[in-house]
Design a protein with these regions (language model features):
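Nucleotidyl polymerases of mobile genetic elements and RNA viruses
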Residues: 1-3, 10-220
């Protein structure tokens, strides 16, 4: 975990835990193991603060042009980070080369090159076709938890992986922090929290299911 990052509601960032890990490490590990056994984290550990960051120079009067980032407590991120480190080593074998995001050794420019190659091939061989560009709106926030559990099962992840996901996301709450004001906390019922080390890997696994369905449909 990187230093000098904005902390969650606890106010303690990764720097604090790194300095005092010899004193706190045992308690952190014990707390996470207890959470797994009881299938429950304390309400404060799952709290997040949502702050919105503008997307480039796009008009800021539209909500869609803001990117919500959730500031999470460090203990929570230590737990999800451990699971993320275990999952990401498997992803290159599970995720098709068409997906180039979030995976080490893959470059998004390869997809741009692929589009040019397809255009050249169709023109050279006089093949009619169409390119459809689809963008997920609020992609991370729209994934249902039941679908995430089904996805983990479809890729034959151990039941403990799904249990960990449910431990971290069940009963999670967030509040919006903007312009010096803080909203009331509200319950989160879907999506992967941007700011969670695990979220990007969960998302590309879910997106891979869509890719598989497209590959299996020979009419596309």
């Amino acid at each position: 975990m990187k230093n000098n990052k904005s902390p969650g509601t606890s106010g303690f960032g990764a720097d604090f835990y790194k300095v005092f890990w010899n004193n706190l490490g045992t308690f952190v590990v014990r707390a996470l193991n207890e959470a797994f056994l009881t299938n429950n984290l304390s309400c404060t550990q799952t709290q997040g603060l949502i702050t919105c960051i503008p997307k480039g120079d796009k008009p800021r009067m539209f909500l869609k042009n803001w990117r919500p980032i959730t500031l999470l407590n460090t203990i929570y991120k230590i737990g999800t980070g451990c699971i993320a480190n275990r999952i990401k080593s498997l992803l290159p074998k599970l995720i098709h080369n068409d997906q180039t995001g979030f995976l080490k050794g893959r470059y998004i420019g390869e997809n741009t090159r692929l589009v040019y190659d397809i255009l050249h091939y169709t023109e050279h061989n006089d093949i009619e076709g169409m390119i459809l560009l689809i963008d997920f709106e609020k992609a991370f926030d729209s994934v249902s938890w039941s679908f995430i559990n089904k996805t983990l099962k479809a890729f034959n992840f151990a039941p403990s992986t799904a249990k960990w996901f449910n431990v971290f996301y069940k009963d999670s709450k967030s509040a919006v922090a903007q312009c010096g004001f803080l909203s009331e906390f509200f319950r989160i019922s879907r999506g992967c929290r941007q700011g969670d080390p695990l979220s990007c890997y969960i998302f590309i696994l879910c997106a891979e299911i869509l890719s598989i369905k497209i590959w299996q449909n020979y009419q596309i």
